[in-house]
Amino acid sequence: MSVAECERPHEEEYVQVRGSDVYFYCEVCETTVLELIMKLRKLEKELLHKYLDLDLHMRPEIRIWIRSDGGDIHSGLSAMDAIASMKRVKVRTIADGMCASAATFILLGGRTRHMTENSYILIHQLNMDGSWGKFQDYKDQMENLEQFMRRFREIYVQETKIPDDKLKKILRRDVCMNSDKCIDYGIVDSVWI
């Protein structure tokens, strides 16, 4: 997970909506997460109006399909918060292929979480791209990174069944987890069929 901005042009759309399905098949960055949040809010509003017009007495469902190698951690956390705040609709998140790094926070935002049978999930510690500065800048940066890591551990412990001691070991490595392990750890609820 890094704190870098997208390297892709801003004119392109990377988040697609098809019916009640939202496809996030891209890098996690300010641009793509803003696009995701805006499209989710619009879809939520459309579905609520549709269900009201049809006099359906149930909560609409939105499925977010995630295929991402990760990206900017702050954007991932922003997406997680936005998804979790959508209380008027049921939001399912589904890892499809690879859901790594900052993208796992998008996954954790879902009310129910799933992954396709041949998908993998990767969680790991923060990494820092090249930086320059004075000695005190490095000390400040290290303090900030330690604070972020504590918060990440809190989120994973709160949102999954991974014990803190096991989580510390997982975060030190870059090891992909299959569906069996992700279900055992409570990262996802089930395999999506």
Where are these regions (language model features)?
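Terminal-region recognition feature
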Residues: M1-I193
